[in-house]
Amino acid sequence: MGKRVVNALMVGAGEYTTGSVFTAAGAAPDKPAGVVAITFTDLKRRGRINDMYLADAVGTRMPAVRDTMRTKIAEKYKGMEFVNAIKTFPNDDVAFDAEAYKLAIAQCSPGDVVTIFTPDDTHFDIAKACMEAKLHVLVAKPAVKTLDKHLELIQVAKENNVLCCVEYHKRFDPLYTDARDRGDSLGPFSFFNATMTQPKAQLDTFKNWAGKSSDISYYLNSHHIDICAWIAGKSSRPTKVTAFAAMGAANKYLNVSDRKIEDTITLTTEWENKVDGSKGIGIYTASWIAPKSDSHTQQNFHYCGQNGEIRVNQARRGYEMAMDDEQRPFANLNPLYMKYTPGKDGYFSGQNGYGYRSIERFVEVCQQMNDGKITKEDVENMGDLATIESSARVTAILEAGRLSLDNSSRGVELVYDKSAPFESEPTALRLF
């Protein structure tokens, strides 16, 4: 892998990548122009990446996607006309091609970077194909839905000596990063409680897979399960999971009867501390039936160690705005995530946002790996990116939650190899 600037392939042309949402509500107010394409375009402007490609299963919507990127990116900021040169796959006349990403992979070279923001049940096949082509992969959370598939991706990444990371951008929120750095001073893990809720309009965006191929826990709880595990570190590990769900509102809102859609899911987990075998508790709640409010995502967490605690309210940053706008007269703003307001010079100025930094950091370390400056082990030791190797416990908790719900909220045990170090990842799940 020679010393050259990487190319970037984006798989999935939806809300998070391009800001394209073809519903009445449109893109969410916290990411109106998407995150991935605008970040890559700015990185290209800064000389950090070379060519850009975009693949989706539906070719017929690509003209609208390109128009969205042109309007929201190229025409809004100076120097961002590169977005108009993104090569898209499949052709515009293709109604549906689930493997169109393979056409785009063929355009890439070993060492290039790929982002995957597609429905959860498609992540595994796409990530595997990309890594087998020697491409570095950044996949949306959850990486996959089952522990078995997660462990298989670890093996594929190892065999091809490529980096595979899960895009947990909250790790780059300065408050969350600081909480993680303070974690050791709080003593052994004792308690974690997190809540994330989003408005019902999100159900319009996700109606094709909600209650079918994934659920609200995979979509939102994944964030804070990762943060909990990140702060607690490898000196604590999850051992048991029980899940509960509320239902009724989502089915009514979408007016569907062919499937049951959980409104809210709570996962209750037991953790074990290495130092003395003491126990901790993690509670993670996610919902997508909230009313429209001053913040798109209401979210907070409380982390308690045996010697201290931390509380973070991410929806209330102390930065408020009110306008004569009937659609959104009042808002709690969070430019720490993505800053879309252009700078006074007309250029995109959101380089410090943690949505941007999460992707930029991935590109940075991939470039350094390609140039022989660092190894995969170095990336693992840095700890800021969620590598596929270090994040299996998050997938295990999520799958255990689904398994619990599908079995009348029975408990699920996370099984570890007894001959492996305490810090190792779980290897299986077992109902009890």
Q: What residue ranges belong to the model's regions?
A:
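Predominantly a Rossmann-like dinucleotide-binding segment in NAD(P)-dependent oxidoreductases
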Residues: 14-17, 24, 163-165, 170-262, ...
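Short, acidic/turn-prone active-site loops that include or flank metal/cofactor-
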Residues: 16, 143-145
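Redox-cofactor binding/interface segments in oxidoreductases and associated redox assembly factors
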Residues: 115-116, 139, 194
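Short helix/strand-capping hinge loops at secondary-structure junctions
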Residues: 134, 140-142
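Contiguous beta-strand/loop segments that form the cofactor/metal-binding neighborhood of enzyme cores
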Residues: 4, 204, 219-326, 355-376, ...
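Hydrophobic residues in well-ordered beta-strands that form the structural core
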Residues: 139-140, 164-166, 312
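N-terminal glycine-/serine-/threonine-rich beta1-alpha1-beta2 phosphate-ribose binding loop
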Residues: 2-133, 151, 155-159
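Glycine- and charged-residue-rich phosphate/anionic-cofactor binding loop of Rossmann-like
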Residues: 50, 54, 372-394
